[in-house]
Structure formats: C-alpha cells, structure tokens
C-alpha cells in the first residue's frame, strides 16, 4: 500500500515539476510563493514515505531524477535529496557457528559455545552465556523497568523542512492578507470619490437655489420700494374711506 501511494505521489511531483518547467522556460515567469509551498510540501511527504517504506532503488532513483529536473533555485535540491542509509552491524555473531545446550531443571539455562575448529581463530570465547540466577523473573522485571533512552523521532533535516514549509505558508497567508487589505483600500477610495462627487453636486444645487431665492427677494424688495414711492401712497387714506363707504352701502341694501 505504501509503495502504491509513493508511486502516486511521485506522479503528482512529476506533474508539478513539468508545470513549473513550462512556467519558467516557456512563459519566462517566476513561480509564486504558493507554488513553492505546494512543491516543498509534496517533496516533504515523499521523503517521509521513502523513509517509512522498504528500500526501493527504483523509486529512490525516480525521485532523485525528478528532483534534478526542477528548473529554478527556489528549492534547495540537496536538502530534499534522499540518500539511502545502509545499516551495518559489525558485531553480529553468526548463528551457524554457535550451538546451544539446554539444562532443564527448575530454571532453564542456555550456554552458547563454538566448535573446536573455530577456537584457533579467536582465543577467548566471548561471554555470551546467561549466568544462572535464583530469581530470573525479578532480574527481567528490573531490566524492563529501567528507562530506555529516548529515540529521536524527527531528524534535523525533516525538522528544517517542516519549519521552512511553515514559514512559506505564513508568507503566503501574509501575502493574501496584504492583497485583501489592498482591495479594501481601493474600495474605500472608490466610496470616498463617490461621496465627494455627490456632495459637490448637492452643494451646487443648493447654491443655485439660494441664488434664485436671493433674486426673487431682490425683485420683491424693488416692487415694494416702487409701491412706497407711487402716488397710491399719498391717496391711500381716501381710497380706504371710499371702500368702507361702499361696503356699508352694500350691507344696508342687503339688510
């Protein structure tokens, strides 16, 4: 299952590298930070799968070949290159040259010795036998209860890759936030321009209305001034008396 998943991840990595090559070589464009984050995340996941799976020279060679095809220097290729570690145990003792003799009593004792033809190769026989103890179970419990040294779960290379991926993700988030703030600033400028234009038009209309009212008041004041200077002002009392007399006559006729 891990091998199938690793093959699928390698196919995805190959597609990403081909797309990146077309972007750099054909379009002459630089990859964005999101592209770098995606590529490094894919490389990190493949490295984890290679470390978990059984050694496979074909998949390792394919991965390193795809890694070499990355066209730009935004990704440190040597940092993501996978090198198979071959563990050799030089102190391993051949089991075929050892024989066991078991003495069965209340407890079981196992003694390991070599043949006579192998004694001349090594003078002393290494102490590989288990000494007899009255309470073997207690000694086993004590050995099991001793704290084991902690094993490193993550290598420095994986830790550096994870930190670099986190930094790139933070950079992409900050870039998206900056773009959002820029769009908000542009929208606020558009709103400001629209409000200013509306206020200017309202002020112009208000000034026109005030000017019209001022002209109307000036005409009315001139008319009143002309009325005050007319002859009707001098004969106004007589006219009022005549109007009152006519009104009285009409009342008398009606009654």
Swiss-Prot record:
Naturally occurring in which organism (per UniProt): Saccharomyces cerevisiae (strain ATCC 204508 / S288c)
GO process annotations (BP): Golgi to endosome transport; Golgi to vacuole transport; Golgi vesicle fusion to target membrane; intracellular protein transport; vesicle docking; vesicle fusion
Subcellular localization: Endosome membrane
Subunit details: Interacts with PEP12, VTI1 and the SNC SNARE complex proteins.
Domain of life of the organism encoding this protein: Eukaryota
Function according to Swiss-Prot or TrEMBL: t-SNARE which may play a role in determining the specificity of membrane fusion, protein transport and vesicle trafficking within the Golgi/endosomal and plasma membrane/endosomal systems.
Keyword Zinc: no
InterPro entries reported in the protein's UniProt record: T_SNARE_dom
The encoding gene: SYN8
Parts of the chain on the Cytoplasmic side: 1-234
GO MF term list: SNAP receptor activity; SNARE binding
Name of the protein described by the UniProt record: Syntaxin-8
Keyword Membrane: yes
Extent of Low complexity compositional bias: 137-146
Keywords from the named record: Coiled coil, Endosome, Lipoprotein, Membrane, Palmitate, Protein transport, Transmembrane, Transmembrane helix, Transport
Lipid attachment in record (S-palmitoyl cysteine): 238
Post-translation changes: Palmitoylated by SWF1.
Coiled-coil region list: none
TM ranges: 235-255
Membrane disposition: Single-pass type IV membrane protein
């Amino acid at each position: 299952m891990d091998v199938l998943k690793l093959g699928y991840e390698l196919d995805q990595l190959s597609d990403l590298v081909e797309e990146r090559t077309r972007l750099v070589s054909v379009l002459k464009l630089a990859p964005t930070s999101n592209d770098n984050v995606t590529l490094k995340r894919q490389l990190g996941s493949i490295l984890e799968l290679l470390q978990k799976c059984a050694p496979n020279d074909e998949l390792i060679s394919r991965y390193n070949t795809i890694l070499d095809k990355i066209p730009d220097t935004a990704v440190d290729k040597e940092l993501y290159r996978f090198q198979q570690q071959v563990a050799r145990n030089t102190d391993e003792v051949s089991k075929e040259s050892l024989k066991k003799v078991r003495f069965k009593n209340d407890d079981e004792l196992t003694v390991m010795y070599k043949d006579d033809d192998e004694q001349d190769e090594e003078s002393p026989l290494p102490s590989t036998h288990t000494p007899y103890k009255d309470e073997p179970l207690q000694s086993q419990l004590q050995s099991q209860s001793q704290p084991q040294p902690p094993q490193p779960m993550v290598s420095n290379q994986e830790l550096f890759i994870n930190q670099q991926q986190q930094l790139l993700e933070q950079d992409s988030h900050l870039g998206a936030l900056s773009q959002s703030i820029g769009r908000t600033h542009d929208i606020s400028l558009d709103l400001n321009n629209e409000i200013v234009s509306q206020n200017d038009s309202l002020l112009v209309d208000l000034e026109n209305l005030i000017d019209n009212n001022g002209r109307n008041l000036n005409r009315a004041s001139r008319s009143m001034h002309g009325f005050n200077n007319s002859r009707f002002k001098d004969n106004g009392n007589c006219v009022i008396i005549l109007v009152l007399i006519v009104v009285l006559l009409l009342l008398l006729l009606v009654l």
